[in-house]
């Protein structure tokens, strides 16, 4: 099965910064990425080798 998630956050105003990270199951999406990244994981069984 193909599952896709898309997160959207409001644009920042001058001087503001994001101070939070997003997480879903064993996938952590941190706020330090400056480009689009494709994350793939079938989530079954848990394989820590896929973790960032």
UniProtKB/Swiss-Prot annotation:
<comment type="function">
    <text>Extracellular matrix serine protease secreted by pioneer neurons that plays a role in layering of neurons in the cerebral cortex and cerebellum by coordinating cell positioning during neurodevelopment. Regulates microtubule function in neurons and neuronal migration. Binding to the extracellular domains of lipoprotein receptors VLDLR and LRP8/APOER2 induces tyrosine phosphorylation of DAB1 and modulation of TAU phosphorylation. Affects migration of sympathetic preganglionic neurons in the spinal cord, where it seems to act as a barrier to neuronal migration.</text>
</comment>
<keyword id="KW-0479">Metal-binding</keyword>
<keyword id="KW-0862">Zinc</keyword>
<keyword id="KW-0720">Serine protease</keyword>
<dbReference type="GO" id="GO:0038026">
    <property type="term" value="P:reelin-mediated signaling pathway"/>
</dbReference>
<keyword id="KW-0378">Hydrolase</keyword>
<keyword id="KW-0645">Protease</keyword>
<dbReference type="GO" id="GO:0008236">
    <property type="term" value="F:serine-type peptidase activity"/>
</dbReference>
<dbReference type="GO" id="GO:0007155">
    <property type="term" value="P:cell adhesion"/>
</dbReference>
<dbReference type="GO" id="GO:0006508">
    <property type="term" value="P:proteolysis"/>
</dbReference>
<keyword id="KW-0130">Cell adhesion</keyword>
<dbReference type="GO" id="GO:0005615">
    <property type="term" value="C:extracellular space"/>
</dbReference>
<dbReference type="GO" id="GO:0046872">
    <property type="term" value="F:metal ion binding"/>
</dbReference>
<comment type="similarity">
    <text>Belongs to the reelin family.</text>
</comment>
<protein>
    <recommendedName>
        <fullName>Reelin</fullName>
        <ecNumber>3.4.21.-</ecNumber>
    </recommendedName>
</protein>
<dbReference type="InterPro" id="IPR034968">
    <property type="entry name" value="Reelin"/>
</dbReference>
<dbReference type="GO" id="GO:0070325">
    <property type="term" value="F:lipoprotein particle receptor binding"/>
</dbReference>
<keyword id="KW-0106">Calcium</keyword>
<keyword id="KW-0217">Developmental protein</keyword>
<comment type="subunit">
    <text>Oligomer of disulfide-linked homodimers.</text>
</comment>
<keyword id="KW-0964">Secreted</keyword>
<dbReference type="GO" id="GO:0001764">
    <property type="term" value="P:neuron migration"/>
</dbReference>
<dbReference type="GO" id="GO:0021819">
    <property type="term" value="P:layer formation in cerebral cortex"/>
</dbReference>
<keyword id="KW-0272">Extracellular matrix</keyword>
């Amino acid at each position: 099965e193909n599952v896709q998630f898309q997160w959207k956050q409001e644009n920042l105003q001058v001087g503001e910064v994001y101070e939070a990270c997003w997480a879903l199951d064993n996938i952590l999406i941190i706020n330090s990425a400056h480009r689009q990244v494709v994350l793939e994981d079938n989530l079954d069984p848990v394989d820590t080798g896929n973790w960032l």
